[in-house]
């Protein structure tokens, strides 16, 4: 069983990985590598899903009567995760945008 701190660090790890994959997806799309961009977005999604699972476990623990421990590290982890989710959502939009721009320039 993981300790509370280990769980918090796992949130940070998966959030950071998800954000990194999302940023790499934007870079790939900018180069016209759309299949790679979509693959990277899927990896970002998998990382963020893992983080969400950890977050859900913490919420269930609190809902079943466990006392929540709110440390600065936990606040940082939650901020890190929410930022990563936003970056992933925006990255998906960027990939679509770069793909549309590529189609427009090849049709012209």
Curated annotation (Swiss-Prot):
Localization per Swiss-Prot or TrEMBL: Cytoplasm
Domain (PTS EIIA type-3): residue spans on this chain: 2-100
GO biological process assignments: phosphoenolpyruvate-dependent sugar phosphotransferase system
GO cellular component, one term: cytoplasm
One family name in Pfam for this protein: PTS_IIA
Highest taxon above the source species: Bacteria
Active site: 76
Domain topic, free-text comment: The PTS EIIA type-3 domain is phosphorylated by phospho-HPr on a histidyl residue. Then, it transfers the phosphoryl group to the PTS EIIB type-3 domain.
Purpose: The phosphoenolpyruvate-dependent sugar phosphotransferase system (sugar PTS), a major carbohydrate active transport system, catalyzes the phosphorylation of incoming sugar substrates concomitantly with their translocation across the cell membrane. The enzyme II CelABD PTS system is involved in cellobiose transport.
Protein name as catalogued: PTS system cellobiose-specific EIIA component
Organism: Geobacillus stearothermophilus
Lineage per the UniProt record: Bacteria, Bacillati, Bacillota, Bacilli, Bacillales
């Amino acid at each position: 069983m993981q300790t509370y701190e280990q769980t918090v660090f796992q949130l940070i790890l998966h959030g950071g990985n998800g954000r990194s994959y999302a940023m790499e997806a934007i870079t790939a799309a900018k180069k016209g590598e759309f299949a790679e961009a979509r693959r990277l977005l899927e990896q970002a999604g998998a990382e963020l899903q893992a983080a969400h699972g950890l977050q859900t476990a913490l919420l269930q623990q609190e809902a079943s009567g466990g006392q929540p421990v709110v440390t600065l590290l936990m606040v940082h982890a939650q901020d890190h995760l929410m930022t990563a989710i936003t970056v992933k959502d925006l990255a998906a939009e960027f990939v679509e945008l770069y793909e549309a721009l590529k189609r427009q320039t090849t049709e012209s």
